[in-house]
């Protein structure tokens, strides 16, 4: 493989067109995900024709895209199909999500490195199982709220193990406790007079019915905000939950470039003002990936 070097491959796989397993592990992963979802189809080419959806569940009204990093990114390469900077389109994934949402469905876009990470893989499984009503349920009325703000290590561990974006800075954090275990967490920070809802997540495999409403209402009663904003990652989030809390949609935020080394799929931090189409990162083998952007919501109190 031009990207990953020499590797062994069974003759049958070669005949069937399967190349380097680091570049094209997609098929086996798709079937792994497919097995989680009853009555779903793979490689649907009719729902948003001519584009394809990797996995589609018409019963539960959602689809899943598995985005291999090599084939869904842009960069320079001696391999012609990967030498694709001239075709750079930062809205490619976002546009597909738009097409699915126009049909009244929700689209999850799973990034390859997330599925290959054992913890994030379990988070994704939890998200999918929740979508098909297979999560274990706890009713918020059976829980009680605790202020966790002074327990940063506990919060960090919970977020890293249960939220795809992991830990973030915060000013306050509340949790829901049931039988001496934390099942939900909400984190907010304050900038001048405006608050931001930065994280909410449940314990993997569980859905706390009414949990986010109970936590957010607690915050409102104690802190009496004048306004709260939040940003929803369109790779997995839907608009519905924010409407329940009284938020209004404000705007769509375009996806930011995410840079990674294709030899190990490690992402790096890069200054925001870097030239996307012309920089030394490409010459050093790095590639750029674009997600689906974010939706901004705001709640204003009168």
Give the residues covered by each predicted segment.
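Active-site beta-strand termini and strand-to-loop segments that position acidic
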Residues: 55-60, 176-179, 299-301
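Nucleic-acid endo/exonuclease domains
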Residues: 2-172, 201, 206-239, 259-267
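C-terminal "cap" of GNAT-fold acetyltransferases
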Residues: 260-282, 287-302
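Conserved beta-strand in the GNAT
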Residues: 175, 180-196
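Conserved catalytic-core motifs of GNAT/GCN5-like acyltransferases
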Residues: 248-262
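Conserved active-site alpha-helix within GNAT-family acetyltransferase domains
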Residues: 235-252
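Structured loops at beta-to-helix junctions and adjacent beta-edge loops in soluble globular domains
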Residues: 148, 189, 200, 300-302
């Amino acid at each position: 493989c031009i990207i990953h070097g020499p590797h062994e491959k069974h003759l049958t796989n070669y005949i069937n067109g399967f190349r380097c397993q680091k570049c094209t592990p997609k098929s086996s992963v798709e079937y792994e995900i497919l097995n989680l979802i009853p009555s779903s189809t793979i490689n649907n080419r009719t729902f948003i024709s001519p584009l394809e959806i990797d996995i589609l569940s018409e019963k539960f009204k959602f689809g899943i895209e598995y985005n291999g990093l090599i084939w869904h990114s842009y960069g320079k390469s001696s391999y012609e199909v990967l030498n694709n900077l001239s075709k750079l389109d930062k809205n490619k994934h976002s546009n597909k999500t738009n097409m699915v949402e126009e049909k009244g469905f929700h689209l999850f876009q799973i990034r390859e490195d997330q599925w290959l990470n054992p913890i994030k893989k379990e988070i994704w499984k939890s998200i999918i199982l929740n979508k098909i009503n297979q999560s274990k349920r706890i009713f918020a009325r059976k829980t009680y709220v605790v202020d966790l703000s002074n327990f940063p290590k506990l919060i960090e561990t919970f977020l890293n193990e249960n939220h795809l974006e992991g830990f973030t800075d915060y000013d306050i954090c509340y949790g829901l406790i049931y039988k001496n275990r934390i099942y939900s967490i909400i984190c907010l920070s304050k900038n001048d007079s405006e608050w931001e809802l930065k994280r909410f997540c449940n314990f993997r495999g569980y859905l706390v019915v009414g949990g986010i409403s109970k936590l957010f209402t607690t915050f409102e009663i104690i802190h009496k905000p004048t306004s709260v904003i939040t940003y929803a990652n369109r790779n997995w989030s839907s608009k519905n939950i924010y409407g329940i809390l009284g938020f209004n949609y404000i705007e769509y935020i375009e996806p930011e470039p995410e840079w990674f080394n294709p030899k190990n799929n490690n992402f790096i931090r890069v200054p925001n003002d870097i030239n996307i189409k012309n920089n030394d990162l490409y010459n050093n083998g790095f590639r750029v990936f674009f997600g689906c952007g974010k939706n901004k919501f705001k709640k204003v109190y009168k």
